Amino acid sequence: MAVRRFGQVIGIKPENIEEYEDLHANAWPTIIKIIKDANISNYSIFRYQNLLFAYFEYSGSDYEADMAKLAAEPEMQRWWKISDAMQWQVPEAKAGEWWHVISENFHVD
């Protein structure tokens, strides 16, 4: 199974940057497990001013099913309730999209 790479962008409210970074520096072990169980690896979030850029790799065979399972986890819903309140959608976000998926333009292994 080929690894799929994803890039995403979202805004971060300036007044929540410190809290957001602290939350992720101390990510709950259950959240890490849920992410790994969804076949996600090499997951990073970067910040540039008031924008967050996420990168991750997906190695499963059914992305939609794995993301639905991840989203159904009560602990993930609790995490999102906290972190989503600190974020804002970029204008380019499509309907139903929180983190806006961006295209890959270059890759070297």
Predicted regions and their residues:
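Eukaryote-biased recognition of C-terminal alpha-helical segments
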Residues: 100-106
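Intrinsically disordered, low-complexity acidic/polar segments
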Residues: 17, 54, 63-65
